[in-house]
Amino acid sequence: MKKYIVLTILFVLPLVVYLFFASGINHFAKLPVLTNDVYDISKISNTTFINKITILGFFGKNIKDKHGDALNLNQKIYKRFYKFNDFQFVMIQPDGTEELTNQLKNELKKGTNTDLVNWSFVTISDQNILDVFQSLKTDFNLDLNFGTPYVFIIDRDGK
C-alpha cells in the first residue's frame, strides 16, 4: 500500500504542479512613458525614431570602455529582434569618435557573427547630444564623456 502512495505522489503531484503553472497567464506590466516629446534626430541626421521601435544609447567618447555593454546589448536584445523591419538600435556619439565606433562595429561583427544592419551610430555635436538626452526627461545624467550606461526604449510614435 505504501508503495502505491509513494508512486502516486511521485507521478501525480509533479503532473498537477505542472498543469497548475502551465495554465497561468502572463500579464506583462507596461513600461512607463517618460515623455511624449523626444527630440527627433531626423533634424540632424539620416536616422529617425518615427515608425521604429528604437533602443537609444549614449556610449560617449570612451567607447573602448563600452565594448562590454555593446556586446551585452547585442546578445540579449538585438539578436532576438533584429529581423523585425521596425526595430533599430541607435547609439548617439560625439563628433570625433568615428574611428572608435568603426572598431566597435568590427569587434561586434567578428566576435558575435551578427548582421549589424539595424545598428545605427549617429555622430553629432555635444550640444545636440545634450538636447536629445534632455528631451528624454529622465533622472539620469550624462557623464563628462557624454555617455551613460543606460539605454532607452522609444516606441513608434517617438515617445
Language model features with spans:
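Alpha-helical transmembrane signal-anchor/signal-peptide segments
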Residues: 24-41
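Hydrophobic membrane-insertion alpha-helices, especially the h-region
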Residues: 2-23
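Short active-site neighborhood of thiol/selenol oxidoreductases, capturing the structured segment around
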Residues: 45-74, 87-92
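Extracytoplasmic
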Residues: 84-87, 146-149
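Well-ordered, non-membrane alpha-helical segments in soluble/globular domains
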Residues: 67-77, 100-107
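Thiol-based oxidoreductase modules, predominantly thioredoxin-like and allied folds used
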Residues: 85-99, 116-128
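Short, internal strand/loop/helix patches
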Residues: 106-148
